């Protein structure tokens, strides 16, 4: 009996030692990945290579009567690989969030495993307007289980689960931003609404367009604006750098106007999306592209059912009645709702 008991104790001790060794190896691996990721970020866009990053900034005035101003910035750093001859963005290897509201600030880091893009480390630093600081670090194993957590205070604001959920939300957001125009299906079977005569509808759209341009321009000058900015630097290292900027303007009812600009040494692009204030349906889209001295333009006007009633273009060989623009607009709205729901 004594021999059996000693054997059990020895086996338990051996198992504990093995678990400790595995944890130590995992912690060593995470710290190595963290150092390599930071080194890549420092070198991003340097030494003759194109930068590869995405920055999202959302500014919100939460209440016009009580000026609580919410601003959030997300930075994604990623690699590109050639898949079937096309440069394809990989999931980010590192994510940084900066958030502030009325003197309260929060800073987050998320490290992804370069092998399988799973979350392996999260860091959070928060500070109240009174100067109280909270810091938390979470380390995860290959199965996504937290194996170590470190805090500077017992009053932690987060848990291993909440930080991992946040990280996975950021990953989902990154994926949707990359596949804009392809992930939100259109409702093609919804009941038809009564429509206004074409001339009256076009007059209505042009009036709303002028109002939206004026409103968005005024917003740009506001100290406390309501807008979402997305800036993307990408393209392979053997191509000229490209910068894509998307500006989404919204009010308490939702998005009312979007403008997108894409610039590189090879080509330039610009597009606009206008939404009906009451229904938030897309009612007008504009696209302009310039490449090798050629300029292409498309304008689509939509009725109350989302059907194109007028197309103006100088490139009649390539027109889709605004189908892609409608999908892209739906995706922008879905991304905006994701961000609003996540903050709430």
Model-derived segments and spans:
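Beta-turn initiation residues at beta-strand->coil junctions
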Residues: 96-100, 123-126, 150-152, 259-263, ...
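Sec-dependent N-terminal signal peptides
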Residues: 3-15
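Short loop/beta submotifs within extracellular cysteine-rich repeat domains
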Residues: 104, 117-120, 145-148, 256, ...
């Amino acid at each position: 009996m004594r021999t059996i008991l000693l054997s059990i104790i020895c086996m338990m001790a051996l198992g504990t030692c093995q678990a400790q060794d595995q944890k130590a190896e995992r912690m060593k691996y995470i710290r190595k990945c963290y150092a390599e990721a930071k080194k890549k970020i420092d070198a991003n866009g340097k030494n003759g290579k194109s930068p590869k990053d995405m920055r999202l900034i959302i500014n919100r005035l939460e209440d016009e009567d009580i000026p609580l101003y919410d601003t959030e910035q997300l930075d994604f750093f990623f690699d590109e690989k050639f898949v079937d001859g096309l440069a394809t963005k990989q999931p980010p290897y590192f994510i940084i969030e900066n958030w502030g509201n009325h003197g309260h600030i929060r800073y987050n880091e998320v490290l992804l495993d370069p092998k399988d893009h799973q979350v392996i480390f999260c860091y959070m630093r928060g500070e109240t307007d009174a100067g109280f600081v909270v810091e938390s670090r979470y380390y995860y194993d290959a199965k996504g289980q937290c194996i170590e957590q470190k805090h500077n205070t017992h009053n932690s604001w987060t848990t291993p689960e909440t930080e991992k959920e946040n990280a996975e939300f950021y990953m989902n957001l990154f994926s949707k931003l990359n596949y804009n125009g392809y992930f939100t299906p259109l409702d093609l079977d919804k009941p038809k609404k009564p429509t206004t005569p074409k001339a009256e509808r076009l007059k209505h759209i042009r009036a709303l367009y002028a109002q939206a341009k004026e409103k968005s321009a005024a917003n740009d000058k506001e100290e406390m604006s309501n807008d979402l900015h997305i800036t993307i630097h990408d393209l392979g290292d053997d191509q000229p750098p490209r910068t894509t900027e998307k500006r989404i303007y919204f009010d308490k009812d939702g998005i009312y106007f979007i403008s997108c600009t894409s610039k590189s040494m090879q080509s330039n692009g610009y597009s606009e999306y206008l939404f009906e204030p009451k229904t938030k349906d897309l009612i007008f889209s504009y696209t302009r592209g310039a490449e090798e001295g050629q300029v292409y333009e498309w304008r689509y006007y939509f009725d109350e059912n989302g059907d194109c009633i007028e197309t103006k273009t100088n490139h009649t060989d390539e027109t889709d009645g605004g189908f892609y623009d409608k999908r892209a607009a739906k995706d922008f709205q879905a991304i905006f709702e994701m961000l609003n729901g996540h903050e709430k």
